Amino acid sequence: MNFETIIGLEVHVELNTNSKIFSPSSAHFGEDPNANTNVIDWSFPGVLPVMNKGVIDAGIKAALALNMDIHKEMHFDRKNYFYPDNPKAYQISQFDEPIGYNGWIEIKLEDGSTKKIRIERAHLEEDAGKNTHGTDGYSYVDLNRQGVPLIEIVSEADMRSPEEAYAYLTALKEIIQYTGISDVKMEEGSMRVDANISLRPYGQEQFGTKTELKNLNSFSNVRKGLEFEVERQAKLLRSGGVIRQETRRYDEANKGTILMRVKEGAADYRYFPEPDLPLYEIDDAWIDEMRAQLPQFPAQRRAKYEEELGLSAYDASQLTATKALSDFFETAVSLGGDAKQVSNWLQGEVAQFLNAEGKTIEEIRLTPDNLVEMIAIIADGTISSKMAKKVFVHLAKNGGSARAYVEKAGLVQISDPAVLVPIIHQVFADNEAAVADFKSGKRNADKAFTGFLMKATKGQANPQVAQQLLAQELQKLRD
């Protein structure tokens, strides 16, 4: 029997506001334990939450970017559960009226086709703290993360393969990153993914019993965990077994999923409206203000790069991987840079440098202006493509004018025949044996002179001009 795979994803995204959702404490990542806390985060008696308007702004932007309807009257709810990293014994979240609902995004599949994935809802909530279980037998609670604003984006169960889930996450991450509401760094926990997967016989409308997957700390692991579950569940069903509703975690070391707990039924969190927060009215003016702040998104930029600039689909995809890179590219082209040459540099030397340094393009000194200037002085023969690599490294580390650096460092390419011909004659005088080999007709003897000339000019001879002049002067020797 063959089975159809049914996948839905729940994605938690930390919003990059300066302060937390209901307290003035810093929401920044990486501080000492409990450094970013105050009485609200610790839930001292009598303290009240105060809404951070920037969180609602971010929620509206996310809803618009994901083609969602927006609840014009929005409220928060209490989700009741007890855990040490949740000092209130409830989480302030949204239940029946999330900020966004009925959305969708389009994904691109490996065969080049596209598919629309529906998004059920996107709701705002506060994050919980973090428990650390020490080797000394004690557990430690860090509430720096307590109250950091989240938006949870819940897809419909529209994905039919692990590959589609991977494509969905890639597209979702791009869109959220372009809005500027989150850096979506999985390694820092600002994007976290839970997956729900079930199988059903082809032709059956009713969903099978779902399994929830956790500990998915990369898109690659999401795909691997889902692939393992497809095989595990199919094997179990074919042998006459029954799928239990359970939560499993992906174990990277064993390349498989491991049981965490069996779910006897749906959790009863006893949601009720949060009495300490008012109803928030989101009018059209507020929505229009947030819409005006949204950029052009990756899909539209890719289409523009292919149709208007003549780039390949691959180049367009690489250049839109992040908004910062795409903005850099567009600025460089607007300054007169050739689109293909700018693209080649960004995907070649620039990408290699960023990977080696572990930096993003915003974190180096290279600018669109000095990259375009460098490309121009390659084109006019001031420097060679080989020398440009050295110039680029200087610009990436120090910034400034490419032309000014080339002139100051003495890197200007020698193209003047009046300068090169005497150097060629000196090369002949210094290498009599090579001249004798050439005159005697020894095979490939002429090729040695190119190296001699480049050494004599410290690599500054224009290769094209040098080859022409060498051929001319060698012919005179033969004559």
Curated annotation (Swiss-Prot):
Signal peptide: none annotated. SMART domains: GatB_Yqey (SM00845). One of its GO terms (molecular function) is asparaginyl-tRNA synthase (glutamine-hydrolyzing) activity. It catalyses: L-glutamyl-tRNA(Gln) + L-glutamine + ATP + H2O = L-glutaminyl-tRNA(Gln) + L-glutamate + ADP + phosphate + H(+); L-aspartyl-tRNA(Asn) + L-glutamine + ATP + H2O = L-asparaginyl-tRNA(Asn) + L-glutamate + ADP + phosphate + 2 H(+). The keyword Ligase applies. Gene3D superfamilies: 1.10.10.410, GatB domain, N-terminal subdomain. PROSITE patterns: GATB. Heterotrimer of A, B and C subunits. Belongs to the GatB/GatE family. GatB subfamily. This is Aspartyl/glutamyl-tRNA(Asn/Gln) amidotransferase subunit B. It comes from Streptococcus pyogenes serotype M28 (strain MGAS6180). The lineage of its organism: Bacteria, Bacillati, Bacillota, Bacilli, Lactobacillales. The gene is gatB.
